[in-house]
Amino acid sequence: EPSAWVGILVMLATGIYMIVQSFRLQLTNADDTRFVVNAVDTVRTNRMLLTDVNTGKEILSWTGDLFKDVISPWAVFAAYLSKITGISAASMMHTFLPPVLLAVMMCIFWLIAGELFDKHIYRSLFVILLLVMYMYGYFSIYNAETFTIIRLWQGKATMAAVGIPALLYAFLRLYRLLPDDRRWKEKTVYNAEQKGAIC
């Protein structure tokens, strides 16, 4: 149907606009430096997270922010991608990961919409609404929308933009695969009543 295709085209245009804006609004600060330095150092030394990003000296014990990096080695994953593709780690994180991760996020939104709506036009409108909310959600530097647009290559932003929606989709999908909810409840209550569990 034509309205579905119009919706899909508007959705794609909105997604492309968001990708362009993510390049324009990129934020590189001390937090970003830590992730990029960890990735570059991992590629350079072939060792994971053993250099203090502030001093350049070897880390003898992990404390504070350094310990946080060890338990969430997203920078090591970026270093791995850098190593197997031959692209520098900084370019991988600032140029290649954002559009790919934004496209993955939009695909997950489309899958969620597929679980919620039958018609393509409603799916498209749902994704457009979410993308617009992400674009206009830039009211604080600490919220998921801002992280998604200005620093998606960082692990916490990827978790908020891709990980949590993917988990939501998995739960929706699993819920759909369950047997009919009403029959399941009736059987459970019936069996419990027979055993005297419910008074």
Residue ranges of model-derived segments:
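Membrane-interface transmembrane helices that cradle and orient dolichyl/undecaprenyl
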Residues: 159, 164-195
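Membrane-interfacial loop-to-transmembrane alpha-helix junctions, especially the N-terminal start
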Residues: 4-8, 121-127, 193-198
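Start-transfer (signal-anchor) and selected internal transmembrane alpha helices
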Residues: 1-21
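Structural signal for the C-terminal ends of transmembrane alpha-helices
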Residues: 1-2, 113-117, 170-179
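Glycine-rich, flexible loop segments associated with nucleotide phosphate handling
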Residues: 63, 150-154, 189-199
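Active-site lumenal/periplasmic loops and adjacent helix-entry segments of GT-C-fold
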Residues: 15-137, 141-154, 158, 162
